[in-house]
From Swiss-Prot:
Entries under Pfam families matching the protein: Asp_DH_C, NAD_binding_3
PANTHER family: ASPARTATE DEHYDROGENASE DOMAIN-CONTAINING PROTEIN, L-ASPARTATE DEHYDROGENASE-RELATED
Family per record: Belongs to the L-aspartate dehydrogenase family.
MF GO annotations: aspartate dehydrogenase activity; NADP binding
The organism of origin for this protein: Xenopus tropicalis (Western clawed frog)
InterPro entries: Asp/hSer_DH_NAD-bd, Asp_DH, L-Asp_DH, NAD(P)-bd_dom_sf
One Gene Ontology biological process: NAD biosynthetic process
Protein name (Swiss-Prot/TrEMBL): Aspartate dehydrogenase domain-containing protein
Top-level lineage group: Eukaryota
Length: 284
């Protein structure tokens, strides 16, 4: 019997999550019929001595030459905006920075490229508990509202614009940095609110304009990341009763860390689910 073909994985970004995924694929990939196709990082010197030189991709424009079946972006939203279409034209694409999809042009282009290529645009659920249920409610037309509150220590945020100053002022007191549509938050916290962006993709009937995001900076939680999710469904006309779900996720995190500890394992599970689901968006 011939050996089963291994799925070839290209990893774009070699930060904390990228390194974790590369190491997992090298150590355990054979158990899941997968192998590394390439690794790319903006600073190539970071790969020196850590990644086989034969697997180091120098130019993302040449990604098609490496025959990857799945490309995983864990670098920065700008990579997905610039190269997402290219990735989807040659492979399935797991977008680890879904805040990039808050840009309407980027989302539309990637959805269309997935449709035309037949490759799947995967969105990892990350810290979003109940993503599949939220998606099902959206599909049924019963999802009426979704609110996500994310709380971290001030030093765990990487922020842009006006939120930088607001966060600096939050070093002594719990402060709500932002409350409003997630679309407006993504450019201000592109590395911190991927969970909210994933929620917007799952709750596609509400989208980035309808899902409410609340970002809280709290100096009293140096080693935790909190995600509170409030889902509102339909109302029973006769009684006025409203369906609702509330979940609270408490994720241990190293001090000053952007990524909580449980997120790494969640991302690995998402990667294992990327087996090809046709030319569409798939929450995993």
């Amino acid at each position: 019997m011939s050996e089963e073909r291994r799925m070839r994985i290209g990893v774009v970004g070699y930060g904390h999550i990228g390194k974790y995924l590369v190491d997992k694929i090298v150590r355990e990939g054979a158990n899941h019929s997968m192998e590394l196709a390439f690794v790319w990082n903006r600073r190539r010197e970071k790969l020196s001595g850590a990644v086989d030189p034969r697997l180091q991709l120098q130019d993302l424009s040449d990604c098609q030459k490496w025959a990857a079946d799945l490309i995983v972006e864990v670098a920065h939203p700008c990579i997905t905006r610039e190269y997402g279409e290219k990735f989807l034209s040659v492979a399935h694409f797991l977008v680890g920075s879904p805040t990039a999809l808050a840009d309407t042009v980027t989302e539309a282009k990637l959805r269309e490229r997935a449709r035309l290529s037949g490759n799947t645009l995967y969105v990892p659920c990350g810290a979003l508990w109940g993503a599949e249920d939220i998606f099902k409610m959206a599909e049924r037309g019963t999802l009426k509202a979704l609110r996500i509150t994310m709380t971290k220590h001030p030093n765990s945020f990487k922020l842009e614009g006006d939120l930088v100053q607001k966060n600096q002022e939050a070093m002594s007191n719990r402060t709500v940095l932002y409350e409003g549509p997630v679309r407006g938050l993504c450019p201000l916290a592109p590395n911190n609110v991927n969970t909210m962006a994933a929620a917007c993709m799952a709750a596609h009937t509400l989208g980035f304009d309808g899902v409410v995001g609340v970002l809280v900076s709290d100096p009293s939680v140096p080693d935790w990341h909190f995600v509170d999710i409030e889902v509102t469904g339909g109302t029973i006309e006769k009684t006025g009763q409203v369906f609702s779900v509330k979940t609270s996720r408490r994720n241990p995190a190293a001090p000053c860390s952007v990524t909580g500890s449980a997120t790494f394992a969640s991302f690995w599970s998402s990667l294992l689910a990327c087996k090809g689901h046709g030319g569409r968006v798939y929450i995993c």
